[in-house]
From Swiss-Prot:
The keyword Zinc applies. Residues 30-294 form the CoA carboxyltransferase N-terminal domain. It comes from Listeria monocytogenes serotype 4b (strain CLIP80459). Its cofactor is Zn(2+). This is Acetyl-coenzyme A carboxylase carboxyl transferase subunit beta. The gene is accD. Its main location: cytoplasm. GO terms for molecular function: acetyl-CoA carboxylase activity; ATP binding; carboxyl- or carbamoyltransferase activity; zinc ion binding.
Length: 294
């Protein structure tokens, strides 16, 4: 009996089943990995949360039309100037090929979508830049669409809300691209002089000529958390000033801390915030007559 305690355990036998070489296919896009916290989540759950990570709050990129759908009242959006597209004014080699690829990738004709809509019944003109199209760089068409949208807001006496996301001026259009900085800024100024309300919401990334022109000209200047906002790149600035910059330099949190933003708002709270601001700025007719449309 004692000998049984010291007997060697019997080895288990395992059978090897040959593989046929095939792998179970997981449908593409069903899961998304957060680049910030590295957690993996169902894409549908991420979309339900407005593309904001459930674990760390990272704001994933979102297309222009998807952003409009999540903000405005259902069925209220009426797009304007949707057919405008660049004509390659400088004859830049392969520029139109790149434009066509971006059209197919994004489903847009240009890097911005503009139109009329309502948020909780409050009317507005809205413009949303889309970084999938030439990194939302500002060329002549982008500048023209912003200009026309602001003019529409002025004529219809509606607030103007713009979401920025851009790599800057579009180099393939040269000076015509740079001219849009002055053109859009002048339109903002004229609208402001007429008493119009402008709200800018800077998203990741808002850089270059866009950040240096209309992006910060709103009556309210907001940003999404973690957005990169600045003119020149971090490395260029460090080499110029010969100083090491803070870790959070050029982030929306850094700008808020230094008084360059009015607020840093989560995408989850943005609709309520905009609705409240629009509601308190509604222009009502004056007693005994209509309000001055100028």
């Amino acid at each position: 009996m004692l000998g049984d305690l010291f007997t060697k355990p019997k080895k288990r036998k395992y059978a090897t089943i040959p593989s046929d070489g095939t792998k179970a296919d997981v449908p593409e896009g069903i899961m998304t990995k957060c680049p910030e916290c590295k957690k993996i989540m169902y894409t549908k759950e991420l979309q339900k949360n407005l593309m904001v990570c459930n674990y760390c709050g990272f704001h994933h990129p979102i297309g222009a039309k998807a952003r409009i759908d999540m903000l405005v009242d259902e069925g209220s959006f009426e797009e304007i100037d949707a057919s405008l597209t660049t004509a390659n004014p400088l004859g830049f080699e392969d520029y139109m090929d790149r434009i066509e690829k971006d059209k197919q990738k994004s489903g847009l004709n240009e890097a911005i979508v503009t139109g009329h809509a309502t948020i909780d019944g409050n009317p507005l003109v809205i413009a949303v830049m889309d970084s999938r199209f030439r990194m939302a760089s500002m060329g002549s068409v982008v500048g023209e669409k912003i200009f026309r949208a602001v003019e529409d807001a002025d004529k219809t006496n509606k607030p103007f809300v713009i979401f920025t996301a851009s790599g800057g001026a579009r180099m393939q259009e040269g000076m015509l691209s740079l001219m849009q900085m002055a053109k859009t800024s002048a339109a903002f100024k004229r609208f402001s002089n007429h008493g119009g309300l402008i709200i800018t919401v800077m998203t990741h990334p808002t850089t270059g000529g866009v950040s240096a022109s209309f992006a910060s000209l709103g009556d309210y200047n907001f940003a999404e958390p973690g957005a990169l906002i600045g003119f020149a790149g971090r490395r260029v600035i460090e080499q110029t000033v010969r100083e090491e910059l803070p870790e959070d330099f050029q982030t929306s949190e850094f700008l808020l801390k230094h008084g360059q933003l009015d607020d840093c708002i989560s995408r989850l709270d943005l609709q309520n915030k905009l609705s409240f601001i629009l509601s308190i700025h509604v222009k009502t007719p004056e007693v005994g007559g209509e309000a001055d449309g100028e």
